[in-house]
């Protein structure tokens, strides 16, 4: 059977998939679209503002934290400097006495006569080598011992002649050496006095 091509085609029956929008409501739909676009633009502006506000607050918080940290660090440094200064002052005050006590303990283990001989011999060899004569003023109890120790100092071979004189005002640790150049106190007591004076001078000068 062949189709009848002489007849005009009949248009299909089209039905809407949903309800039709009346022409009177088209304005409402356009307004709704504009409102939606405006809402999206506002949302974008809010996000931009919020991001900028976050960055500002973050920077402010960092700056405040940095300033606070700097202030705290300055306070810590100031306290540390004060503590060091206080400890230094205490040390400067106690160090001389501590040194004296340590030396006294160490030297206390030696015989006073031996220390006196060493001090005198050191002075003669270092400062009076070449002098004609030196006279040692010592405690009477030390005369014989020093006479034996320096019996070889007879004025020959550039060694001064050593003469011993008793002096009851001196302790067994003391000795005053007289020479053509003047006199000088020797012995442990004199050295400890010189050490104390040296500490006192350094303390007064602020160098200790």
UniProtKB/Swiss-Prot annotation:
Write out the annotated subcellular location. Answer: Cytoplasm
Cross-referenced InterPro entries, in alphabetical order?
A: T3SS_SctL/SctL2, T3SS_Stator/FliH, T3SS_stator_protein
The terms describing its cellular component in GO are: cytosol
* Coiled-coil intervals, chain numbering: none
Main localization category = cytoplasm
Q: Which GO terms describe its biological process?
A: protein secretion by the type III secretion system
> Which of UniProt's keywords are assigned here?
Cytoplasm, Nodulation, Plasmid, Protein transport, Transport
| A Pfam short name | T3SS_SCTL
Is Cytoplasm found in the keyword set? yes
Function noted in UniProt: Component of the type III secretion system (T3SS), also called injectisome, which is used to inject bacterial effector proteins into eukaryotic host cells. Acts as a regulator of the HrcN/SctN ATPase activity.
Per the similarity annotation, which family is this? Belongs to the SctL stator family.
Assembly and partners are described as: The core secretion machinery of the T3SS is composed of approximately 20 different proteins, including cytoplasmic components, a base, an export apparatus and a needle. This subunit is part of the cytosolic complex.
Q: What is this protein called?
A: Type 3 secretion system stator protein
Specify the species. Sinorhizobium fredii (strain NBRC 101917 / NGR234)
Q: Upper taxonomic classification of the species? A: Bacteria, Pseudomonadati, Pseudomonadota, Alphaproteobacteria, Hyphomicrobiales
**Name of the gene encoding the protein in the UniProt record:** sctL
